[in-house]
């Protein structure tokens, strides 16, 4: 199965109950995900001999399968496809939260080059920045999971100035949108989320 998937440029995912470390090692997995969400399984004989994984790539500890699946798929897909030397568009922002205005800007960024790097400013949490950086990244990964490999998301310092010399080989551009898109307000979105108890 794995050989055929690799020949077709695809990724094979296998789900096993494998209580022994040496048995798991025989799969020669590129990435190992440990779903660690229960104290014991329903099979007593498996519980008795179970050996916890020593080292895994991902350790899922909460019952939020859809969320974790999207995040893990995004991260693994990115490793296979992202090309650091390919022409890339950069977007810098707080994304508190990611909204249709950001999406419209992102769509234009993708149209300029084949991949986009999203830089999340690491802000102190307050009313205007309710999400810590790691939660912003999770939200972005869920929103953009279908573009894994074409989008890279990074936390950067709280950047307030960007300086450059002449002849640098890249452009800094402001995108202009229609009034409906331009008027999308993250402040109003946060206020509505608070009213609905989502924030």
Give the label of every model feature segment.
Residues 31, 47-84:
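NTP-dependent small-molecule kinase module
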Residues 15, 34-36, 60-62, 119-120:
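Conserved beta-strand segments of the P-loop GTPase G domain that flank and frequently precede/overlap
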Residues 6-7, 14-55, 165:
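ATP-dependent NMP and nucleoside kinases share a basic, alpha-helical "lid"
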Residues 79-199:
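Nucleotidyltransferase catalytic core that binds NTPs
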Residues 32-34, 57-60, 89, 116:
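Short, well-ordered beta-strand core segments
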Residues 40-50, 68-72, 182-188:
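Short, charged, surface-exposed secondary-structure boundary motifs
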Residues 1-5:
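Conserved alpha-helical scaffold flanking the Walker A/P-loop in AAA+ ATPase domains
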Residues 12-18, 147, 154:
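Phosphate-bearing ligand-interacting subdomains
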């Amino acid at each position: 199965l794995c050989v055929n998937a690799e020949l077709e440029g695809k990724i094979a995912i296998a789900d096993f109950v494998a209580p022994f470390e040496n048995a798991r090692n025989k799969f020669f997995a590129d990435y190992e995900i440990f779903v660690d969400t229960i104290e014991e399984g329903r099979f007593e004989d498996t519980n008795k001999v179970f050996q916890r994984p020593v080292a895994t790539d991902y350790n899922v500890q909460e019952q939020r399968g859809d969320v974790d699946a999207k995040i893990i798929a995004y991260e693994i897909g990115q490793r296979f496809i992202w090309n650091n030397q390919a022409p890339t568009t950069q977007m810098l922002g707080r994304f508190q939260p990611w909204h249709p205005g950001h999406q419209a800007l992102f769509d234009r960024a993708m149209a300029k080059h084949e991949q986009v790097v999203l830089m999340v400013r690491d802000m102190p949490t307050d009313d205007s920045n309710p999400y810590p950086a790691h939660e912003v990244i999770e939200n972005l990964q869920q929103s953009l999971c279908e573009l894994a490999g074409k989008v890279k998301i990074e936390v950067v310092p709280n950047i307030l100035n960007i300086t450059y010399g002449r002849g640098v080989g890249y452009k800094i551009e402001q995108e202009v949108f229609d009034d409906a898109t331009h008027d999308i307000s993250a402040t109003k979105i946060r206020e509505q989320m608070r009213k609905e108890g989502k924030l």
